[in-house]
C-alpha cells in the first residue's frame, strides 16, 4: 500500500524555493518532500533516472578505458568524464543526504517577526525572493542553452577519434558515430534505429545531467542569498533599534560625557547639552539636513511616553522603576525589540551552519573535480590552431566550468562580507544615546560578530573569491607541469 504525500501550506524557505523543489522532483532528483503524489512512485521515478544516468556514465568510462593509448584522445575523454562526474556525484549525494536538505529547508519554516520591524523584514524578504527567482531562471535558461549548443555542434566538423598506428607510431583519425558524446555501446550505434536511440538517449543524458547538477547548486546559492538578505535586514534595523531605545528612555544622559578626556590637565570644554541649557541657540541645519538624519521616522509614538502608574498621565515613572527610567511596558517594548534582533541573528547563524553541513562535502568534491578538469582544459587549449569545432568545444567547456566555480564563490564571498559588516553597523549606530541595556546589547553584538560567517568545503577550504583565485593559481601550476612533461 502506498502513501500519498499531499502538499500543505508552506512558509519560509520551502515556499520561496518551491519552483526549484518542483523542478528537482520532475527532473528525477530525490527531492520528494513538500510535493504531492505517491511516495513510492516518486522513488521509482527517481530510481529509473539514476539507472539511466549510471548506465550512460559507465559507457563513457568504458570508452575512456578503450581509447587510452592516444594522449589527446585520453585527455578529451577524461574531461568529458569529469564533467559528468559532477552530475552523478550530486544526484547520489542528494539521495543519500535527503534528511539534511529537508532539515535546512525547514529551519526557516515559521514566520517570526516584530511589529516595529515587520516592514523591513518584508522588504528584505521580497528582495531575497526576487534574487532567488532570478537566479533560478537564469541558470535554467543557461542550462537549456548549453545543452542545445552541445547538441548543435555535433553536426559540425568531422566525427572521428584519434588512435595510435603501431606501425608508424603516429596518431590517425578513425570515423565514429556522429553523437554528442564519445561513448561505447554494446550495439552498433553507427546507423539505423540504434543510432536514433543512442542519439536521443545522449540528448536526454546531457540535458538532465546538467539540470540535476545546476538545480542542486541553485538551491545552495539561494540559501546563501536568503541568509545575506537577512543580515541586511538586521543591519538595517540596528539604527532604529537604538533610536527606539533612546526615545523610550525617560533619562537622557549627556552623550558628550562619554567622550570626555580622562586627562586631569585637559582644558577642553564639553559640548553643551541643550536639555540642561535650553537657552543655547545652536543652528543644526548645517549638520543634519533631513529628518532621516535624526531618525525621526523611527521614533516611537508619543503615546509610549505617557505610560505610568497614574492612568498614563504622569511622567512615566512608577515606584520601583528600573535604573534606566523606563516603565514596565516601555521596558518590555525595548527588550522585545532587542530580543527579536538577537533571536533573528541566532536563527541566521543556525541556517548558515546547516547550509555548510548539508552541502560542504559536495562542494569539496566539486572543487577537486573542477581543478583537475580545468587543468586538462588549459592543456587542451594549447592545441587550438584556429576557429573551428575543436576551439568552440574547448572554450565552451572552459567557460562553463569556470562559471560553476565562480557561481559558488561569489555568493560565499558575499556571505562573508555581509556577516563581517554587522559589527560595523552595530558600532556605527547611535548606541551612546540608547539605554544601558541597549549599550550592553551592542557590546555583545560586536563581540559575537567579530568572526564572519562562512561556508566551508568539508572544513578544507572557505568558499570565497579567494578560493576562486586559488583554483586558478593551482590550474596554472599544474598546467605548467603538464607542458613540461609534454
From Swiss-Prot:
Coiled coil spans: none
Superkingdom of origin organism: Eukaryota
Glycosylation sites recorded in the entry for this protein: 169, 188
GO molecular function: calmodulin binding; coreceptor activity; intracellularly gated calcium channel activity; ionotropic olfactory receptor activity; odorant binding; olfactory receptor activity; protein homodimerization activity
Pfam families: 7tm_6
BP GO terms, sorted: behavioral response to ethanol; detection of chemical stimulus involved in sensory perception of smell; olfactory behavior; regulation of protein localization; response to pheromone; sensory perception of smell
Alphabetized UniProt keyword annotations: Behavior, Cell membrane, Glycoprotein, Membrane, Olfaction, Receptor, Sensory transduction, Transducer, Transmembrane, Transmembrane helix
Residue ranges annotated as Extracellular topological domain: 69-75, 157-191, 373-390, 484-486
Major subcellular site: membrane
Chain ranges passing through the membrane: 48-68, 76-96, 136-156, 192-212, 352-372, 391-411, 463-483
One Gene Ontology term, aspect cellular component: cilium
Membrane topology of the entry: Multi-pass membrane protein
Distribution of this protein across tissues and organs: Expression is restricted to olfactory sensory neurons (OSNs). Coexpressed with Snmp in a lateral-distal population of OSNs. Expressed in the embryonic antennal-maxillary complex, in all 21 OSNs of the larval dorsal organ, in the pupal antennal OSNs, in all 120 adult maxillary palp neurons and in approximately 70-80% of adult antennal OSNs, where expression is highest at the dorsal-medial edge. Localized to OSN cell bodies and to the distal portion of ciliated OSN dendrites.
This protein's record includes keyword Transmembrane helix: yes
Keyword field contains Transcription regulation: no
Localisation: Cell membrane
Cytoplasmic topological domain residue ranges: 1-47, 97-135, 213-351, 412-462
Function in brief: Odorant coreceptor which complexes with conventional odorant receptors (ORs) to form odorant-sensing units, providing sensitive and prolonged odorant signaling and calcium permeability. Orco is a universal and integral part of the functional odorant receptor, involved in the dendritic localization of other olfactory receptors. Expression of Orco alone leads to formation of rapid and transient ion channels not directly responding to odorants, but directly activated by intracellular cAMP or cGMP.
Assembly description: Heterodimer with conventional odorant receptors (ORs). Complexes exist early in the endomembrane system in olfactory sensory neurons (OSNs), coupling these complexes to the conserved ciliary trafficking pathway.
Miscellaneous note of the record: The atypical heteromeric and topological design of the odorant receptors appears to be an insect-specific solution for odor recognition, making the OR/Orco complex an attractive target for the development of highly selective insect repellents to disrupt olfactory-mediated host-seeking behaviors of insect disease vectors. Odor-evoked OR currents are independent of known G-protein-coupled second messenger pathways. The homomeric Orco channel is thought to be a cyclic-nucleotide-gated ion channel that depolarizes the olfactory receptor neuron.
Family note: Belongs to the insect chemoreceptor superfamily. Heteromeric odorant receptor channel (TC 1.A.69) family. Orco subfamily.
Protein's recorded name: Odorant receptor coreceptor
Originating organism: Drosophila melanogaster (Fruit fly)
Amino acid at each position: 500500500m502506498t502513501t500519498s504525500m499531499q502538499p500543505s501550506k508552506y512558509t519560509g524557505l520551502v515556499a520561496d524555493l518551491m519552483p526549484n523543489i518542483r523542478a528537482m522532483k520532475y527532473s528525477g532528483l530525490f527531492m520528494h518532500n513538500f510535493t504531492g503524489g505517491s511516495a513510492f512512485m516518486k522513488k521509482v521515478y527517481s530510481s529509473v533516472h539514476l539507472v539511466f544516468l549510471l548506465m550512460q556514465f559507465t559507457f563513457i568510462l568504458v570508452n575512456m578505458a578503450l581509447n587510452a593509448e592516444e594522449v589527446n584522445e585520453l585527455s578529451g575523454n577524461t574531461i568529458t568524464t569529469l564533467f559528468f562526474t559532477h552530475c552523478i556525484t550530486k544526484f547520489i549525494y542528494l539521495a543519500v543526504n535527503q534528511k539534511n536538505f529537508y532539515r535546512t529547508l525547514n529551519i526557516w519554516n515559521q514566520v517570526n517577526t516584530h511589529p516595529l520591524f515587520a516592514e523591513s523584514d518584508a522588504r528584505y524578504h521580497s528582495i531575497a525572493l526576487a534574487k532567488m527567482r532570478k537566479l533560478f531562471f537564469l541558470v535554467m535558461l543557461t542550462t537549456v542553452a548549453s545543452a542545445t549548443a552541445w547538441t548543435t555542434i555535433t553536426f559540425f566538423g568531422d566525427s572521428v577519434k584519434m588512435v595510435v598506428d603501431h606501425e608508424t607510431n603516429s596518431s590517425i583519425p578513425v570515423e565514429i558515430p556522429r553523437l554528442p558524446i564519445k561513448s561505447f555501446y554494446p550495439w552498433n550505434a553507427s546507423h539505423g534505429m540504434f543510432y536514433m536511440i543512442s542519439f536521443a538517449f545522449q540528448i536526454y543524458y546531457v540535458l538532465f545531467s546538467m539540470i540535476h547538477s545546476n538545480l542542486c547548486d541553485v538551491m545552495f546559492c539561494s540559501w546563501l542569498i536568503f541568509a545575506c538578505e537577512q543580515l541586511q535586514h538586521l543591519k538595517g534595523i540596528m539604527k532604529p533599534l537604538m533610536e527606539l531605545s533612546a526615545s523610550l528612555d525617560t533619562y537622557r544622559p549627556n552623550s558628550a560625557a562619554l567622550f570626555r578626556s580622562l586627562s586631569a590637565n585637559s582644558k577642553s570644554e564639553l559640548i553643551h547639552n541643550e536639555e540642561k541649557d535650553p537657552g543655547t541657540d545652536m543652528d543644526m541645519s548645517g549638520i543634519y539636513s533631513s529628518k532621516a538624519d535624526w531618525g525621526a521616522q523611527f521614533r516611537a509614538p508619543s503615546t509610549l511616553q505617557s505610560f505610568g502608574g497614574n492612568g498614563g498621565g504622569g511622567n512615566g515613572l512608577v515606584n520601583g522603576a528600573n535604573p534606566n527610567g523606563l516603565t514596565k511596558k516601555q521596558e518590555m517594548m525595548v527588550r522585545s525589540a532587542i530580543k527579536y534582533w538577537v533571536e533573528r541573528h541566532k536563527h541566521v547563524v543556525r541556517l548558515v551552519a546547516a547550509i555548510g553541513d548539508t552541502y560542504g562535502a559536495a562542494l569539496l568534491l566539486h572543487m577537486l573535480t573542477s581543478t583537475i578538469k580545468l587543468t586538462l582544459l588549459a592543456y587542451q587549449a594549447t592545441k587550438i590552431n584556429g576557429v573551428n569545432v575543436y576551439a568552440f568545444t574547448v572554450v565552451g567547456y572552459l567557460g562553463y566550468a569556470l562559471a560553476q566555480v565562480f557561481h559558488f564563490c561569489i555568493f560565499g564571498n558575499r556571505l562573508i562580507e555581509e556577516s563581517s559588516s554587522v559589527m560595523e553597523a552595530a558600532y556605527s549606530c547611535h548606541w551612546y544615546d540608547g539605554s544601558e541595556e541597549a549599550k550592553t546589547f551592542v557590546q555583545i553584538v560586536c563581540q559575537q560578530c567579530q568572526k564572519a560567517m562562512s561556508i566551508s568545503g568539508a572544513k578544507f577550504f572557505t568558499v570565497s573569491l579567494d578560493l576562486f583565485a586559488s583554483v586558478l593559481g593551482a590550474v596554472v601550476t599544474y598546467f605548467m607541469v603538464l607542458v613540461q612533461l609534454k
